[in-house]
Amino acid sequence: MLLSAKFLTEIAGEKQLYFTGSGAAEFAIEGWSAYCASKAAVHMYASVLAKEHPDLRIHAFRPGKVNTPMQAEIRATTAENFPGVAHFVEEFESGSLVLPETVATSLLHVIDRKDEIPVIFSTSNYTV
């Protein structure tokens, strides 16, 4: 947040800010209180900044369930430590996780768009 505030005041010209949000900002996930709360804060911060700076493109994107090292760490935990682990293992085994490259391509597509997009959006809605 401090870095983005500095960016808004110190950098001249056209500006765009994209924050990494999460669906976890909208759902209470047992064992993830800090993660859910921090992602909810990211969503609200982006929403408030967008109101304060309507001339700028400010967004928080939800990348979806992405096959990252974080996902591997989640799957390696026990049900005792994270009751929802079975769901994440199932998502991985079914092949339904999104590749990081897919998210990056979708985000680049959004950045290049000149039309209106919601402040909070899912990259799965903007595939190439």
Question: Predicted regions: what is each one?
Answer:
Residues E10, F27, V48-R57:
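Active-site-adjacent segment of SDR/Rossmann-fold oxidoreductases
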Residues Y18, I58-F61, Q71:
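Hydrophobic structural elements of the Rossmann-like NAD(P)H-binding subdomain
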